[in-house]
Amino acid sequence: MAERVDVPFDLAWEACGLVIRYSGNLMASDVLACHERIAADPRFDDLRFAIVDARSVQALTATSAEIELIEAFLQGPAMTNPAISAVFVATEPSVLAALGTYNAISDRAYRITVCDSLTEARAQLGARPAQPRSS
């Protein structure tokens, strides 16, 4: 996978949760870099939910092999913290196609849900509105 200098994602940690905001033209390497950063963060162990906001993504370039590589990476973090619920907010066809490819992996690390809005995502999780983490 190609490497990029700029990172088209933002991480907003909340009490027991995380909102990931992707934007622009996203590559599989960006998604992997995001997951690497999250898994390396000491707050990862307390993470119970992740809302992935991909509404600002213009396009996602990811082959099936790259999605499988991301999934292979996620197996490690899932072993240390299997309690994470993930909900994606996405409408871009290339993002939805990649999520479909991920969901087709039978032994994937995490089960994901796709919603149309942040409100719906929080309702799916039973998560309260953003509460910045104190630390």
Whereabouts are the PLM-identified features?
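Amphipathic, Lys/Arg-enriched alpha-helical "gate/interface" segment within cytosolic domains
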Residues: 2-135
